[in-house]
Every structure is written in structure tokens, then in C-alpha cells.
Amino acid sequence: GSFPKYGNDDDRVDEIAEWVVSTFSSKLAKQHTYRNSVPTLSVLTITSNVVYGKKTGSTPDGRKKGEPFAPGANPLHGRDAHGALASLNSVAKLPYTMCLDGISNTFSLIPQVLGRGGEHERATNLASILDGYFANGGHHINVNVLNRSMLMDAVEHPEKYPNLTIRVSGYAVHFARLTREQQLEVIARTFHDTM
């Protein structure tokens, strides 16, 4: 539909995400805990977004039955259509004070979006993007700078990429060690090609 989608720096929907985190956190805080511990919350999935997605029916946002959920605090694959910075801004709005165990954002860019002037320019531009994310309240980010086509080739020809390491959701792994289903989920994620 034409409704607003999380991941596009649109307060109409980003405020719903903030509300969900705040409401869940406040309800969790009211529960009795073992040894009077302080409950904390995290927004991360490792790879459970694939497993839980397989067991869950369709959702109101258009996700089909059996499809993976978004990893961590990421927008659902392809929903963040207004560029890399808009996606980062949406995630940075989530209230970290209520998620002290972390808000995981696994973020992928194609190398060219960081500039065409060489490695130094790309590194400088990436550092600027990360500085902005942290200045806006972001805390935890995993960054991949690569092309989707390379991952697709690595699925078919893993022997060509024995050391291809990617960030998944809070951890790094050799791409070949993921299950095929997990590899395809990573490939389906948004690879930002615009700022």
C-alpha cells in the first residue's frame, strides 16, 4: 500500500516503532524478576528472523507468510526506499535508554555510494555517515560495504570466496558457513545505492 513505512525517516511510522519499544519496555519493567534484577530490552535477532518468519503468518505491513522478518531494528527488506541516511535516521530514533542490551542495525551499502574517488574518500565518507548516526542517537551498527552480485555469485561458487566475511546481525561470519536460506535472506536485504 501507500502507507508510510519504517526506515524512511517518516515520523508518522517511526513514532509507532518508538511507541512499541517504549510500551513493551514499560510492561516488562512491571514484571517480577528473579533476584530483583533490572529487566532490560534488546532489539536484535542474530538469525532468528529467518526461523521466526518461517513460522509466522502474513503481517499487516505486507510481509507474506513464511518470509523472514527484518533483522534486528532494520527496516523490512526494501521498505527503506528513501536512501541510506533516511534508514539510519529511523533506527536512531528508537529509545536506547529502554534497550540497554542494544539496538542492532545491520546496514549495507554498495561501494560506489561512498564515492568514486578511491578507498580514502570512501572511508572518510563512511566515517561521516557513522558520526551522523551516532550524533542522532544511534548506538550499534554493523556495516557491510559490498555488492549484492558478489554475494549471489558466492552462493553458487563458494570456492571462489573462502574468506568472504559479512556482518549478519551483531556478529561477523564467513558467508559460506550460513545456511542457503540465511544466505538468501542476507541477499534480500536492502543494499543502499543512494544516500
UniProtKB/Swiss-Prot annotation:
Keywords: Acyltransferase, Cytoplasm, Organic radical, Transferase. Residues 71-195 form the Glycine radical domain. It is found in: Cytoplasm. GO terms for molecular function: formate C-acetyltransferase activity. Its EC number is 2.3.1.54. InterPro entries: Auton_GlycylRad_Cofactor (IPR050244), Form_AcTrfase_GR_CS (IPR019777), Gly_radical (IPR001150), PFL_dom (IPR004184). Residues 54-76 are annotated as: Disordered. The modification Glycine radical is found at G170. Pfam families: Gly_radical, PFL-like. Its main location: cytoplasm. Residues 1-64 form the PFL domain. It comes from the Eukaryota. It catalyses: formate + acetyl-CoA = pyruvate + CoA. Transmembrane segments: none annotated. One of its GO terms (cellular component) is cytoplasm. Belongs to the glycyl radical enzyme (GRE) family. PFL subfamily. This is Formate acetyltransferase. The gene is PFL.
